[in-house]
Curated annotation (Swiss-Prot):
Family the entry assigns: Belongs to the dynein heavy chain family.
Methyltransferase among keywords: no
Protein name: Dynein heavy chain
Recorded GO CC terms: cytoplasm; dynein complex; microtubule; motile cilium
Keyword entries, A-Z: Cell projection, Cilium, Cytoplasm, Cytoskeleton, Dynein, Flagellum, Microtubule, Motor protein, Repeat
Keyword Cytoplasm attributed: yes
Natural source organism: Oncorhynchus mykiss (Rainbow trout)
C-alpha cells in the first residue's frame, strides 16, 4: 500500500535535546583539544541517539504497522472473498444443479409411471374387448345350435303329424304317447336352453366381468398405493437433500473456521478462542453426520417397507385371482353336471318314446300293416332326428361350450398373468429408477462437496501463500527503508557534527580574539 511509509512521524529528527549546547562549561573552549573532545562527545551522543531512535523506533513502528496492516487487511479480504466465493457461488451452483437434476429425475419417474399405467389400462381394455368378442362368438355358436335343435324339432313334429294324419283312425293311443313324448322333449330342450343360457350368462359373463373388474380395481388401488409410496420416497429424498444441504453448509463453515484458525496461528493471543470454536464445530458436525446417517437409514427402512407392501399386495392379488378362478371352475363344473343331467333326461325321453312306439306297434301289428310301414318309416325318421339331435347337442356341448369355457379360462389366466407380470416389471423398473436417482443424487452431492472443499482448500492455500509473500515483501521493504533511514540519519549526524565542529571552532576563534 502506498500509505505504508508515508506516516513517518515529523518529529523523528526534531527531538534533539535543547540542552545539548546550553551545558557547555565556560572553560571548554580554552584549548583546541577540549573543542575536539567536545565535538567527539557531540558526535557520539548524536550518533547513539539517532541510531537508537531511528533503528528501534522506525523498525518497531514499521514492523508493527506492516504486520497489523498486512495481516488484518489480507485476512479480512481473503476471508471475506473466500466466504463469498466458496459459500455463495459453490452452494448456489451445487444446490441449483442438484434441484434441477432431481426435478428431471422426478419428471422422468412420473412419465414412466404414467406410461406404464396407460399401457396396462390399454392392454386390459384390449383383453376385455377380446374376451367380449369370444363371448359373442360363443353366443352365435349356441344360437346356431338352438336353431338346429328347433329345426330338428320341427322335422320331428312334421313327421309325427304326417304319421298321425295317415294313422289317425288306427292308433289314437300312440298319438297321445307321441304327444306326451313331444312335450317331454320340448321340456328337456327348454331345460337345456335355460341351463345353457343361464350357465353362459352367469358363469362366463358375470364371473369374467366380476373377476376382471375386481382385478382392475385392485390393480388400480395397488398402482395408486405405489404412487403414494413413490411420492413418500420423493419426500424422503427431498428431506435427505435438505439434510445434505444443511451438512454442506456446516462443512463449509467448518472449513472457513479452519482457514481462519490456520491464518490466526500468528496471533497467539486468540489461540484459546479458536480452539474452543474448533471444538464446538467438531462436536456439532459429529452430531449432524450422525443425524444424517440416521435419516438415510430411516429412508432405507421406508423403501424396504414399501417393497414389502408391494410384494404383499401382489401376493394378495394373486391369491384372490386364484380364488376367483377356482370359483369359476366350480361354476363350470356345476354347469357341466346340469348339462349331463339334461342329457340323461333326453335319453330317458327317447327311451320312453322308443318303448311306447314299440308297444303300439306290437298292439296294432295285426290291424294295420300299412300303418306299420308308415310307423316304421316314421320311426326311422324319428331315430334319425334323435340321432341328429344327440349329435348336435353333444357336438355343441363338446365343441362350443367346453372349448369356449377352456379358451375363456385360458384367456383369463393369460390376461391376469400378463397384467401381474407387467405390473411387477413396472414396479421393479420404478424401484430401479428411484434407487438409481437416489444413488446418483448422493454421488453427485458427494462429488460437489469434495470439489467445493478441494476448491476452498486450494484457494485458502493461495491466500496463505499470497499473505506470506506480502509479509516477506513488507519485511524486505521495512529492512530497506530502515537501512535508508539509518544511512540518512548517519549522513545527517555527520553533517550536523561538521556544522557543530565548524560552529565550535568559529566560537573558539571569536573567544580567542576577544581574549
Amino acid at each position: 500500500p502506498s500509505m505504508l511509509f508515508s506516516t513517518v512521524p515529523s518529529t523523528l529528527f526534531s527531538t534533539v535535546p535543547s540542552t545539548l549546547f546550553s551545558t557547555v562549561p565556560s572553560t571548554l573552549f580554552s584549548t583546541v583539544s577540549s573543542v575536539i573532545q567536545y565535538s567527539i562527545h557531540v558526535i557520539q551522543y548524536s550518533t547513539l541517539h539517532v541510531i537508537q531512535y531511528s533503528t528501534l523506533h522506525v523498525i518497531q513502528y514499521s514492523t508493527l504497522h506492516v504486520i497489523q496492516y498486512s495481516t488484518l487487511n489480507v485476512i479480512q479480504y481473503s476471508t471475506l472473498h473466500v466466504i463469498q466465493y466458496s459459500t455463495l457461488h459453490v452452494i448456489q451452483y451445487s444446490i441449483l444443479h442438484v434441484i434441477q437434476y432431481s426435478i428431471h429425475v422426478i419428471q422422468y419417474s412420473i412419465h414412466v409411471t404414467q406410461y406404464s399405467i396407460l399401457h396396462v389400462i390399454q392392454y386390459s381394455i384390449h383383453v376385455i374387448q377380446y374376451s367380449i368378442h369370444v363371448i359373442q362368438y360363443s353366443t352365435h355358436v349356441i344360437q346356431y345350435s338352438i336353431h338346429v335343435i328347433q329345426y330338428s324339432i320341427h322335422v320331428i313334429q312334421y313327421s309325427i303329424l304326417h304319421v298321425i294324419q295317415y294313422s289317425i283312425h288306427v292308433i289314437q293311443y300312440s298319438i297321445h304317447v307321441i304327444q306326451y313324448s313331444t312335450h317331454v322333449i320340448q321340456y328337456s330342450i327348454h331345460v337345456i336352453q335355460y341351463s345353457i343360457l343361464h350357465v353362459i350368462q352367469y358363469s362366463i359373463l358375470h364371473v369374467i366381468q366380476y373377476s376382471i373388474l375386481h382385478v382392475i380395481q385392485y390393480s388400480i388401488h395397488v398402482i395408486q398405493y405405489s404412487i403414494h409410496v413413490i411420492q413418500y420416497s420423493i419426500h424422503v429424498i427431498q428431506y435427505s437433500i435438505h439434510v445434505i444441504q444443511y451438512s454442506i453448509l456446516h462443512v463449509i463453515q467448518y472449513s472457513i473456521h479452519v482457514i481462519q484458525y490456520s491464518i490466526h496461528v500468528i496471533q497467539y493471543s486468540i489461540h484459546v478462542i479458536q480452539y474452543s470454536i474448533l471444538h464446538v464445530i467438531q462436536y456439532s458436525i459429529l452430531h449432524v453426520i450422525q443425524y444424517s446417517i440416521h435419516v438415510i437409514q430411516y429412508s432405507i427402512h421406508v423403501i424396504q417397507y414399501s417393497i414389502h407392501v408391494i410384494q404383499y399386495s401382489i401376493l394378495h392379488v394373486i391369491q384372490y385371482s386364484i380364488h376367483v378362478i377356482q370359483y369359476s371352475i366350480h361354476v363350470i363344473q356345476y354347469s357341466i353336471h346340469v348339462i349331463q343331467y339334461s342329457i340323461h333326461v333326453i335319453q330317458y325321453s327317447i327311451h320312453v318314446i322308443q318303448y311306447s312306439i314299440l308297444h303300439v306297434i306290437q298292439y296294432s301289428i295285426h290291424v294295420i300293416q300299412y300303418s306299420i310301414h308308415v310307423i316304421q318309416y316314421s320311426i326311422h325318421v324319428i331315430q334319425y332326428s334323435i340321432h341328429v339331435i344327440q349329435y348336435s347337442i353333444l357336438h355343441v356341448i363338446q365343441y362350443s361350450i367346453l372349448h369356449v369355457i377352456q379358451y375363456s379360462i385360458h384367456v383369463i389366466q393369460y390376461s391376469i398373468l400378463h397384467v401381474i407380470q407387467y405390473s411387477i416389471h413396472v414396479i421393479q423398473y420404478s424401484i430401479h429408477v428411484i434407487q438409481y436417482s437416489i444413488l446418483h443424487v448422493i454421488q453427485y452431492s458427494i462429488h460437489v462437496i469434495q470439489y467445493s472443499i478441494l476448491h476452498v482448500i486450494q484457494y485458502s492455500i493461495h491466500v496463505i501463500q499470497y499473505s506470506i509473500h506480502v509479509i516477506q515483501y513488507s519485511i524486505l521493504h521495512v529492512i530497506q527503508y530502515s537501512i535508508h533511514v539509518i544511512q540518512y540519519s548517519i549522513l545527517h549526524v555527520i553533517q550536523y557534527s561538521i556544522h557543530v565542529i565548524q560552529y565550535s571552532i568559529l566560537h573558539v576563534m571569536i573567544l580567542a580574539c576577544s581574549m
